[in-house]
Amino acid sequence: MAATFFGEVVKAPCRAGTEDEEEEEEEEGRRETPEDREVRQQLARKREVRLLRRQTKTSLEVSLLEKYPCSKFIIAIGNNAVAFLSSFVMNSGVWEEVGCAKLWNEWCRTADTTHLSSTEAFCGFYHLKSNPSVFLCQCSCYVAEDQQYQWLEKVFGSCPRKNMQITILTCRHVTDYKTLESTGSLPSPFLKALKTQNFKDPACCPLLEQPNIVHDLPAAVLSYCQVWKIPAILYLCYTDVMKLDLITVEAFKPILSTRSLKGLVKNISQSTEILKKLMTTNEIQSNIYT
């Protein structure tokens, strides 16, 4: 009961029934129709990560590292890390492509790894012909959060071997680096490392300090290795230039002295020249006036 003015008594409306009706309407709105279900399933199929054979372009029945024995796996994620491996590692030996990942999301659509331009997104897997247990992944595409577990299962499998060593290379913008100093005073680019508990080799640079964190696919791979007790190290290059950049690529050079990459690079000066040619080609392709 409620009073509107002195002496008058009226009934106040009860909200109990109204709230029940609102909840029923919300439930009806949330109830999935057959059309909604079909759209959701189509989108889920479209977002599936597929690992294809190089020759036949058919899907692998088992994960990549279940099919091929692996002792060393180097993963480059992002354009600058990919350019580093292309110039310094892949040009120092004969590498054979064993597969490629096909995926689609809001940020990228992977292209075939043959006849690529420098702007196309791709994710290719290779092994060294002279030592097929040495694997390399070049991933220039964005793997969305809901696709990362799929990617890990397609590459490592549900019960991975522990007798291999993983090295991950990637970049982040220097503004993501948390420090008491001003980021403007930091000597960008610079390397930091983060490793799993089972990785016993020394890192070639300082370890990443708390409260800094890693993101996206590099974080997913490192977490996966930590859970499965696989020795793994992530080398993270903080830079103020996220596009393909010569100085940023060369910031990875200290990694060449590590056990992971030692012996894979034959001629550093020749590889540097190859890198410069790659950068020149990229600048020409990026110039809309040429």
From Swiss-Prot:
UniProt PTM: Degraded by the proteasome upon completion of 20S proteasome maturation.
Question: Mind listing the GO biological process terms from this record?
Answer: proteasome core complex assembly
Note whether NADP occurs among the keywords. Answer: no
Q: Which UniProt keywords apply?
A: Acetylation, Chaperone, Cytoplasm, Endoplasmic reticulum, Phosphoprotein
Q: Phosphoserine occurs at which residues?
A: 182
- Give the protein's biological function: Chaperone protein which promotes assembly of the 20S proteasome as part of a heterodimer with PSMG2. The PSMG1-PSMG2 heterodimer binds to the PSMA5 and PSMA7 proteasome subunits, promotes assembly of the proteasome alpha subunits into the heteroheptameric alpha ring and prevents alpha ring dimerization.
What protein family is recorded? Belongs to the PSMG1 family.
This one is known as Proteasome assembly chaperone 1
